[in-house]
């Protein structure tokens, strides 16, 4: 099937916002007015089209960004709905990576909220052009002008109004279009489908003229001819003004602001017009950078069907009907069902099975997809989020996505053997779908450890395990991975002798045990000369030493960074064996750990807190109370960044503490940095708990 829309007519955009700002409702209205939904789904009653997982419909929040295709004014819209909760930031990050533009939805009452700040910063990171929609103008306390001020104060944005509201709260009737200088009023009884132009109300004429001037002045600055004409007293016409606003959005010079009430069906059609008029097409965003698979030199792929195929996999989902679905953005070339691809990130071959166009959780099979398309592929074997798929003959690796390290972990134990099998399958699927969710096995306890971005993140994973995969399991409290090591060099001479009639056991070992460099782990070497311990018994010595590493003498934690040198020993022609030397070295090593001043080590995390300036003092005070060491602070935009080293043991519950004292406006990232000796008073508490 040939291309239905030129690539210039594509708008790949996301809808981003804080939780509860009305993002999903806005998307629902867009789908309704573009003819994709026959009935309007409401978040309140759990019927929203885009929120299709049970967990989303119950909690009224969007967890997975569903992709959908719609059409408006002859343009093709690929819309990605993103979650607004801080624990699902990863979903937002990967959506922004593949979008060309975004609509930032604000709650007319709350304005720029904490997650709006986080998402805005992420959009800055990926240079995503955006327009702003001030939603919920019908809500008590809605204040359009305060929201505009907050865009400047909180996210250092550059808002320019393209619309003003007519009335607010219960009296919100419509908008003033500052480009056309007309009032647009909606008729209540027609579900927002009917609206008409009127003259601007007399009481708003002055305000409209003032904001129209601000808009025109901001726009003409981008074009010398328009500026010259304006200075000569000539206002730009509607087409010129729209062209200049588009230039401003694509070049990220300013953020046009629109308003309405998605719930009351007002303002959605002009917002769709703004998406079409102002947000960039793939052509506006230009070529994407990558690395040539063979030469490893930088290369680019232009947004064109004529270029070699390059595709980025940005989301993987397990679909109950189709199996594994991989959401992809095609940056260049044409993809056909059945064609062979190279996963250049992993150097693995793949074949395109079914190609699907997604509408929330409905799907339509297609045979071909083109540059600019966002499609879902079924049946790919080894693709992970962030992988590049491409033409094997002209292979390229596109820029990789970056994923934050998980900051919280819990242990999970299946209740039965059947649950154990189901758990293994379920966890491998969940980990493939979500790169910020990690699964590992604790070798000391044998427990399965789940790691995620926050408590809600892990709650929802556990909920999916129980409901979708029917796994019955016990969930443990979060734990810290302590370690043990030596502080001084010591020497041990140990003899193992056992006589029980017949062949006995005999082995003597003499070794030095000393601290190794941090991070070097365990090292063993033999300095035996002259056969005091025969060669065939030395592996037995090493095996005995290694068997002690799993559990130290303080509280049974793994032993790290120790060097053992075998210096001497003795054997018996008949009674010695590899097993006897293994037993001797095991007992001797434990003795050395007792004598060598064993200490506890704890993981130290590198913590970065991004906070509005008002809360900096509270952040620093709180980190100090957690045995943290402040490394420094600097400014980022209009936010303060505090860097610190803090023991992991003191970081549990931090996400909730930080959220509460900063009203959720501060965010933090945390990653492992190094192990450090535990202070003696804390070591005694740990010993009492675990020994």
Swiss-Prot record:
Gene3D superfamilies: 3.30.230.10, 3.30.70.240, Elongation Factor G (Translational Gtpase), domain 3, P-loop containing nucleotide triphosphate hydrolases, Translation factors. Disulfide bonds: none annotated. GO terms for cellular component: cytoplasm. The keyword Translocase does not apply. The keyword Magnesium does not apply. GO terms for biological process: ribosome disassembly. InterPro entries: EFG_II, EFG_III, EFG_III/V, EFG_IV, EFG_V, EFG_V-like, EFTu-like_2, G_TR_CS. GTP binds at residues 17-24, 81-85, 135-138. Residues 8-283 form the tr-type G domain. It holds the Pfam family EFG_IV. Keywords: Cytoplasm, Elongation factor, GTP-binding, Nucleotide-binding, Protein biosynthesis. It is found in: Cytoplasm. Its main location: cytoplasm. Catalyzes the GTP-dependent ribosomal translocation step during translation elongation. During this step, the ribosome changes from the pre-translocational (PRE) to the post-translocational (POST) state as the newly formed A-site-bound peptidyl-tRNA and P-site-bound deacylated tRNA move to the P and E sites, respectively. Catalyzes the coordinated movement of the two tRNA molecules, the mRNA and conformational changes in the ribosome. Belongs to the TRAFAC class translation factor GTPase superfamily. Classic translation factor GTPase family. EF-G/EF-2 subfamily. This is Elongation factor G. The gene is fusA.
